[in-house]
């Protein structure tokens, strides 16, 4: 009886950790763009991997999904988008390669790990003004955590 509850707790902890990692990477990219007075790119890799680089230049920081979030899955909106670029004012600008800009990341775990009903999916949203926010897509409207 305790084992399934523990599995649910661990899976949801991975969701929270991966969500926080995505949020932190996006905030890092935004802050570095402002600090460096340059364009900085947040690039999402596979799973919850990401890399922050100065556009056309040096890597600022990289995070691997093996850092505690191996089971987490991240769905990107729009589909196929892989990066977002911040300008020196912390706003979103067009990616240098012309690719679509990430506007939303939905973090979950596979239903083979825990049921969808037990999963506490999280979302990271990015506005054109550069604001990054985490929210719960399943929370009731009007609550502080609702998207």
Model-assigned labels for residue ranges:
Residues 1-31, 35, 39-147:
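N-terminal helix-rich module
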